[in-house]
Amino acid sequence: LCSSFSILFLFWSITRLGIKAIVRKGEEFTTAKQWAVIGAGAVGGLAYTFSDSFWFSAVEGEVYAMSSFFTAFVFWAILKWEEEDTTNPIGAMRWLVVIAYLMGLSIGVHLLNLLVIPTICFVYYFKKHKFEWKSFIITGIISLILLGGIQNIMIPKIVKFAADYEVFFVNKLGMGFNVGSIVYFVLLFTAITSLILHTINKKESYYKFGFYTAVLFAAIATISGYGASALITRAIVLGALLYGIHKLKTKSENTLNVILISFATLIIGYSSFFILIIRSQANTPMDENDPENAITMLSYLNREQYGDWPLTYGQYYNAPTKSQQYFKDGEPVYAKNEKTQKYEITDDRKKSIPVYEEEYCTVFPRMWSQQANHEASYRYWGDVQGHHKKKVKMNEQSGQMEEVQIPTFMANLNYFVGYQLKYMYLRYFAWNFIGRQNDIQGLNGNPLEGNWKTGIKGVDDFFLDTDTAFVQHAAKNNMANNSFFALPFILGILGFFFQYKNNKGDMWVVSLLFLLTGLAIVFYLNQYPYQPRERDYAYAASFYAFAVWIGLGVLFLFDLLSKKSNAKTAAILATVVGLIIPTIMAAQGWDDHNRSKRTMSRDFAVNYLNSCAPNAILFTNGDNDTFPLWYAQEVEGIRTDVRVVNLSLLQTDWYINQMRRAAYESAPVPFTIPAEKYVQGTRDVVYIMDKGTGPMNLKKAIEFVESDDPTNKLDYGSRPLDYFPTNTFYVPVDSMQVMREKVVAVKDTARLAKNIKWTINRSYLTKNDLMVLDLIAHNNWKRPIYFAVTTGAEAYLGLEEYFQLEGLSYRLVPIKNTETEMQQGGRVNTDVMYDNIMNKFMWGGLDKKGVSLDENCTRMASNMRMQMATLAGALINKGQKQKAEKVLDLCLEKMPDENVRYEATLYTIIAGYYQIGNMKKATDLSAKLFDIYENDLKVYQSQKSIHRASFNREIGQAKEIMRRLVMLAEQFKQDAHSKELMTRLTAIVPMEELMPQEPQGPTQQPEQVLQ
């Protein structure tokens, strides 16, 4: 619905701008021009409807559809103000009030909508003033100040002041909880209401009461701030606002009235956030950040879990920090203490903000992330090898002198232009209006993945620097291969020039909307390399602005055709020609945006839940692993006995508290560490310092860490550090309890371990790791504990030897995997997993002809294929070949190549067929997989040398898969097949590169095969 209304407002906006551009002063708005304007609105609206990014947002359960709605609504509303201001300037002011209210509401959706503010200012400017560069620049400065004031002052400070009031009234004045918040809102409401009443009734008493209330409000806000700098800043800013109110009262009360009412309605819209507080008070099962009061609400608004990044001045990726004495202080973290009836500081954040060596810092920092895996990409995109300063310094770890390369500002700009601007914005722009190559995520700029294209081979070959007819298997028949032939782009450029020629003021307005929702976001996001997903949705408002020009392009055609034909005929022809463009866009984009056959997110979420025993605790990691499971439980009520615990969120105290509450049919997670021991700022990191004492009982280890005894801490100046005195732990196994809880099958009781003993090969653990260990130490097998197969080795804490695969999750069991089991992917409970896959699992439409699967879906499906191959291998090892064949057949049936492309995981399927004796199916699949990798290898090897390095991993994988297919055929005496494959392999891979190795077990995991 939001997306539909966005298109309606876009249509109205284009027609309004079209009328202003096509009807010159003194001219009649003829029927032909009316038809042309309606055609322009239709073409522009439909072009945006079928643009890739907007279409994706329209069918995605995210905030961006509603964000587009507010952007479209506000832009149309300011055009309505402009239209009515000529005939009824006083009445038109109501549109400004509506805009303020919409802005307030939009804050609760996404801050991107605030970028329309400068556009609003320039519509006002061009309506009230003639163009002059001086006034134009002043308007731009004012608009940016207004934008910055709302985003960086009003939005955070309204809640920040409430939080400061709360702490001040409770801690300083000794009053009860929430008194400060109540006083804050009463004063704010009273001051605004009284001042508005004064502007209406002109009563001086209202003004005095409101103004003095505002003074009192400002005084408390000032003295309740943390630190001298906050006190001084607040005194200056709030004093200036009070002075401005007083001056406006004497000069223009009408202006003061509009400002106050707009501010009030903006706050009313912003107050939609109170829903979060009300909801949080109910302690719902899903309650992110637990925003029950002003203190926690501030943390929620500040998005503290996402961190921050430098914009105007900051460090390069390899910048060393100065010593901690130079670090800056952050604002302290307060938490409510019910016992003391105070807000207590749990993390003073003193010396918590790092300060970097100036030599490694720059203005406009773009290459700032210090994650180790980002450096190579920074060096590539920034051409650091060609633009750097050399410095010799000591390596702190090795103690050796080494030469480091400090990027120059030119390298910084190279990265900004090459990666952030071109690759992470203009590439997305081209997807929407020129064409798209495929939906494989582009990470390193290679010519085969995620690029734009026109559909004109010569043009695409030139710009992509490759033969576009020659593609890898994963990209063949990719539904996101969309050719627009650059027609929307061309029509948009024509529309831009038409508007420039006929109405420069509106051209500036649309251009500002285009730039501020495009380039300005590029600047603000300051994206690091290897983003977890494509980010085109963030720039949808910029594409919205370009769609305006696409619509106006129809008027360009009308203007051109009307010079050579009848005006009405020209209007019809221009519209028909224009409509060809959204028709092409719809036809090309329909298949990859059609989700009617796909229910993967829901079905696979249910599969994760059904992989667990009753009353289980399932650890997941990341949004994609967690949100669908929450949906299945919250909306459809599926397996609400399973407690889903997100490891990313488990690093926060509020989430741990929520896990300690019951939810639906799930009992509380039995953590034992007291809340005050894990509150934010406490035990966020626990170091591992092996003192050589040998294995330690995990319960004792947890007691050691949670103790506040100074002898249990590492001495680190004023901040003692928590640590484990060993990296090897054990948990005694109560065999009777294991039997009572039916943790393992009766037939496996002989393999029960007396202790679970393992080593954590890490130097430190984070709070989520500590809580997982606490659970394992004290659970005593009462609740089944599972880890989703997608959480990753880091989350497993070295416990893999005690994992048992039961579907899409590993169960922690007191049985140690044998070396053979570990080589074959780990122990599998074949009875449980076979029943889950064959009888319980759903397939999300993977087997439906023409189903649209994006890269994420394909990755999930490949993971499912891998788990089924693992089950088949385990069944084969137990001699249950018929069951294994059923699993393998089901895998091929539910995940055919046309939907889920064959890739490395198919190797294990092939090995399974060989081992059960189905040689025909094995060799047929082997031939297909060999064909795929033979083609892919030729594609990669055909790339120019400048690009080939980015495919080193794929080239190595292709060679290894083909070599192992030959070895499998030899191992199972398929001589003709092996000879054919070997002949083809040696024709494209030199013999010296085919290192002779012993054949790997046929049930080995693909990742292990390809290491």
Regions found by a protein language model. Give the residues of each.
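Acidic/glycine-enriched connector segments
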Residues: F11, T15-I19, Q34-G41, S68
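ER/secretory pathway lumenal C-terminal domains and tails of membrane proteins involved
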Residues: R16-R24, S53-F54, V59-S68, F73-V98, ...
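Short hydrophobic/aromatic helix or loop-helix immediately within or flanking a transmembrane segment
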Residues: L1, F5-L8, L464-T466
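Phosphate- and divalent-cation-binding pockets in alpha/beta enzyme and binding domains
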Residues: F627-Y631
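Short helix- or helix-capping micro-motifs
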Residues: G41-T49, M103
